């Protein structure tokens, strides 16, 4: 599994990792939503602050689709960051 999902009231949160970075994503769980917005944050280590990853607007029909899209955006962001360092 790429990430683990937990529920906090109306908010769903997923935590995952890629190349030593922590990925945190969140979306809303409310009935009647036509699209599921996703927010994505990445942190390199526990001592670093989280950085918000800009996620393009996209029609996401389910929380799984939202988290998969958010995870894909985060891994692309991390890989681009790692590439600039080399």
Label each residue range with its predicted role:
Residues 23-57:
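A short, structured beta-strand/loop element
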Residues 10, 42, 83-84:
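Short, intrinsically disordered low-complexity segments
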Residues 1, 16-19, 39, 65, ...:
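Intrinsically disordered, low-complexity segments enriched in small/polar residues
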Residues 16-21, 27, 57, 76-80:
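Terminal alpha-helical segments
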Residues 46-86:
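Mixed-charge, Lys/Arg-enriched low-complexity segments
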Residues 11-14, 29, 34, 60-64, ...:
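Short linear sequence motifs
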Residues 7, 24, 29-31, 66, ...:
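A generic structural micro-environment signature
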Residues 1-24:
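Negatively charged, low-complexity tracts enriched in Asp/Glu with abundant Ser/Thr
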């Amino acid at each position: 599994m790429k990430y683990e999902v937990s529920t906090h009231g109306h908010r769903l949160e997923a935590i995952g990792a890629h190349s030593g970075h922590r990925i945190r994503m969140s979306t809303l769980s409310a009935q009647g939503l036509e699209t599921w917005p996703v927010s994505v944050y990445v942190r390199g280590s526990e001592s670093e602050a989280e950085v918000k990853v800009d996620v393009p607007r996209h029609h996401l029909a389910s929380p799984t689709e939202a988290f998969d899209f958010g995870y894909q955006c985060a891994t692309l962001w991390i890989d681009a960051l790692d590439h600039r360092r080399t």
